């Protein structure tokens, strides 16, 4: 998703005012990512967090495959919307950011819903084709 989605300032303000409130660990991830410099561009926006949460919740989704986890903001946003028996399989090739993400998942007590796999996503998916 990234920051390519064009959301007007007016829409962004509305979403922030009336949308879901962020979990404390989501806020912590955002603050952590602010310190990362340019690489933080891989973080999704707050409105995208809320949108993912809403889609998962309204659609009653129970299983999610995420490709690219970074420090876990989008993953955590979806996990918070999943039922307690829901599951996210999160593929990412970066061991360092994955370790950071897993720590955030534990802190938010959502790690039981999230299985992270360190892999090149394309290769992993090709190997598991049916």
What residues fall within each predicted segment?
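N-terminal auxiliary segments of SAM/dcSAM-dependent transferases
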Residues: 1-22
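N-terminal glycine-rich anion-binding loops that anchor highly charged ligand groups
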Residues: 25
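Beta-strand-loop-alpha "switch" segments that mediate conformational coupling across diverse proteins
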Residues: 29
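Class I SAM-dependent methyltransferase Rossmann-like catalytic core
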Residues: 36-44
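SAM cofactor-binding core of SAM-dependent methyltransferases
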Residues: 46-119
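Conserved small/polar residues in nucleotide/adenosyl-binding loops
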Residues: 123-130
């Amino acid at each position: 998703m990234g920051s390519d989605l064009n959301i007007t300032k007016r829409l962004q303000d509305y979403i922030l005012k009336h949308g879901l409130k962020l979990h404390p660990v989501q806020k912590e991830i955002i603050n952590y990512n602010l310190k990362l410099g340019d690489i933080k561009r891989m973080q999704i926006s707050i409105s995208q967090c809320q949108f993912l949460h809403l889609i998962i919740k309204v659609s009653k989704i129970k299983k999610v495959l995420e490709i690219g986890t970074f420090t876990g903001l989008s993953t955590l946003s979806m996990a918070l919307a999943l039922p307690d028996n829901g599951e996210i399989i999160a593929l990412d090739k970066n061991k360092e950011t994955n370790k950071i993400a897993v720590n955030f998942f534990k802190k938010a007590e959502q790690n039981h819903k999230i299985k992270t796999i360190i892999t090149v996503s394309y290769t992993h998916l090709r190997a598991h084709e049916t």
